[in-house]
Amino acid sequence: MPTAAWPSGEPVTAALATLAVDSRCALGEGILWCERRRVLYWTDILAKELWRHDPASGHTHTWSLPAPLGCLALADDGRLLLGLAKALHAGDVEAQLGRRDLLTTTLADVEADEPMTRINDGRADRHGGFVFGTKSEHADLRPVGRFHQYTAAHGLRELALPRAAIPNSICFDAAGTTMYFCDSVAPRILRCRYDTATATVSDIGVFVELDMPGAEPDGSVIDDEGALWNAQWGAGRVVRYLPDGRVDRIVRTPAAQPSCCVLAGDTLYITSARVGLDAAALADQPLAGGVFAHGTGRALARAEDRVRLP
C-alpha cells in the first residue's frame, strides 16, 4: 500500500476501499457484523430500510420499516435492537427473512417531550447496555439532542453529556470504562469515563481533532488492538487512530460521504451516502451509497457486544 505524509511528519499507510455491495443507499449507516451468522446489517435511514448481506453467498435482503432506523445492535437472544425515530424496538429479523415489512415490538419510547429529535447513532456497551444519541431535526441543527443508556433492568437513563446536534462515533474501549463520542458538527472526537451500572459519565475530554477542513466525524468502531476507526463524512476516508490519538492508517473510499464502519475478521466494511449529492457529484462518484470493503492485513475485529433484552 502507498504511504502518505501526515502533518506530524510520520508515515501513514493509505489504501483505497473497493465496492462490496452496490446498495446505493440514500443514507447508509450503523453497519454491524454478526459473527454468529456471519452477515452484515445496516440501515438506510432516509429510505426507512434495514439491510442484511451475506458476504459468502452474496445474498442481500432488505426490510421496510415504519420509521427511520437511526441505529441498531445485536441482542443476546439473537434479535436486533432497533432505534426507530422516537422509540427503541426489538425484532427477530432472521425469522422474517421472507418478509418485506419487518414486525417489531416496542421496548421504550424516547424523548416524547422533544418532538424535534430522532434517534441517531448508538452502540451496545461492553456489559449488556445500549448507548445512543438523538439528533436535532431543527433546520438550524440547534443542539437539542441527548445521549441515553438503555438496559433491561433500568430502562432509559439520560447520560450527563452536553447536548448535541448530530451525535455520532459512539463506541467503547475493551474494558467498557471509556466511551468515545462526538457531535458531527464539530471536527473532533471526544471521550469520557463511563460506568454501565450507574449510567454515569465523567472526565470528558478531546480524543482527537480532525485535520482536514470540511471533514465531519461520523460512525466509529474500536478494534482488537484498542485503535479507533472513524468514518469521516465529506472527506472520503476512514482514519484509524491509535489509543494515544496518533494516526496509523487512512482508508480512502470511492464516495465522499462514508458514514460508518465495522470490522469483520480482517476486513473493514464501510457504509456511505448519496444524500445531498447533485447530478454532477453522482456522476463523479457513482458508487456513493454503497458498502465498501478494505482488507486490513490481519484480523482486527472484536466480536460485537450484545444488548441484554427483557
Question: Which residues does each PLM region occupy?
Answer:
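Conserved beta-strand positions in repeat-built beta-propeller and related beta-rich domains
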Residues: C34-E35, L40-L46, L80-K86, F130-L141, ...
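A short loop-to-beta-strand structural motif that recurs across blades of beta-propeller domains
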Residues: E49-W51, A87, G145-H148, R188-L190, ...
